[in-house]
Amino acid sequence: MSFSVDVLANIAIELQRGIGHQDRFQRLITTLRQVLECDASALLRYDLRQFIPLAIDGLAKDVLGRRFALEGHPRLEAIARAGDVVRFPADSGLPDPYDGLIPGQESLKVHACVGLPLFAGQNLIGALTLDGMQPDQFDVFSDEELRLIAALAAGALSNALLIEQLESQNMLPGDAAPFEAVKQTQMIGLSPGMTQLKKEIEIVAASDLNVLISGETGTGKELVAKAIHEASPRAVNPLVYLNCAALPESVAESELFGHVKGAFTGAISNRSGKFEMADNGTLFLDEIGELSLALQAKLLRVLQYGDIQRVGDDRSLRVDVRVLAATNRDLREEVLAGRFRADLFHRLSVFPLSVPPLRERGDDVILLAGYFCEQCRLRQGLSRVVLSAGARNLLQHYSFPGNVRELEHAIHRAVVLARATRNGDEVILEAQHFAFPEVTLPPPEAAAVPVVKQNLREATEAFQRETIRQALAQNHHNWAACARMLETDVANLHRLAKRLGLKD
């Protein structure tokens, strides 16, 4: 079988459409799956000896959250080491990373697999994987045809990585080094709230502004701080962490600013504080709202003048530190209550960030579940850990008051319970493995199967209604903010909401 010019032209056009948008790779994968008639396909980005899914088709949604470390996936390692098309025979002894992850085929294993490494020059930047349930599914395609597909995909991925780096570093093309490995904290999520947060992180990271990160317990505020530091000019210098809630009042000042020998009982030598350790780098103050008013005053002085005094020392030391602070409290309310200094609040919140709770992140819960499943698989030496349809349904309808941290612990506990009831190294997580409070669930199929008796207008209105509801929830029912998120005029949004029955 050979590809027609029209087929190749269509693939090339899909690769160029909407460059810079979230779905540019999804269109490629969808087109390839149709052309190659495979059961599943994935586009993966290579970074620091792991493959990160950028787009999938025909695979369970949680695959997008998984991070495939080469040492745990021999097929992917073989693709990474190869300089050409890799075909895995049906009787290959190497486990397929997507076994159990094709919806409706969870109990079956992939029988045909092709891997296409993607290169920019001599540098591996990603891979395309094609999977089928029939052993000879890809025999009709020659290696030359598959190389052509790989070349088109590699060009698109290469350009996207270059644009991404130019946008994040604000560099001129002549200064760019697009294929060097750039450390980047993994922030998993494609929901509107997380997409907006990532954009704001990218904006503020390049500056030297202090940042106040707000969010409920367990939402990942420390991860946000790491992402800001790693994307900043200070990334080559230390990121120092201090949990203010765990500081006894008697040692808090010493922890922050250090002390000299003999400053107090037990001070047997000079000791640097966190500000000195973070000099030329970043200091992350977690739970900043727990600091006493006395310490808040001393912290304010450092932010104002850039110098510190060790406990027991009259000399001042200059420090160059960027401060990132996090809190699960409403500091505006704390200021009004007299528990937090207004001047310190304004110094810290030059660029405030809000981390959305997991219950407002939609399908991100499934992506995160996939990430934690893959972590468990590696740590416990399992061949696979997958979620059943019932488990996915439960996770999507539970509110997670403990947010991402609660989800992580729930997945780890579920894996232990599932292993206790099943022999072997393959684990399928069922709803009964999760000890959540009672949740009212629709049938598992209800979330995935569309209403077939709707006409086009009814289906469109249902989609619009649900989109507006989600946007309102994420913006605390602020219609102006909702309109900005949906990129529409607020007056038009009000009219549409009335027509859809969302407003009186």
From Swiss-Prot:
Pfam families linked to this entry: GAF (PF01590), Sigma54_activat (PF00158)
GO molecular function: ATP binding; ATP hydrolysis activity; DNA binding; DNA-binding transcription factor activity
The Sigma-54 factor interaction domain, residue ranges: 187-416
SUPFAM superfamilies: GAF domain-like, Homeodomain-like, P-loop containing nucleoside triphosphate hydrolases
Iron-sulfur among keywords: no
Pathway where it operates: Nitrogen metabolism; nitric oxide reduction
Binding site for ATP: 215-222, 278-287
Origin superkingdom: Bacteria
CDD domains the UniProt entry points to: AAA (cd00009)
GO biological process, one term: phosphorelay signal transduction system
Keywords assigned by UniProt, alphabetized: ATP-binding, DNA-binding, Nucleotide-binding, Phosphoprotein, Transcription, Transcription regulation
SMART domains associated with the record: AAA (SM00382), GAF (SM00065)
4-aspartylphosphate modified-residue sites: D57
InterPro entries: AAA+_ATPase, GAF, GAF-like_dom_sf, Homeodomain-like_sf, NorR, P-loop_NTPase, Sigma_54_int, Sigma_54_int_dom_ATP-bd_1
DNA-binding region coordinates: 479-498
Role: Required for the expression of anaerobic nitric oxide (NO) reductase, acts as a transcriptional activator for at least the norVW operon. Activation also requires sigma-54.
Protein name: Anaerobic nitric oxide reductase transcription regulator NorR
Organism: Shigella dysenteriae serotype 1 (strain Sd197)
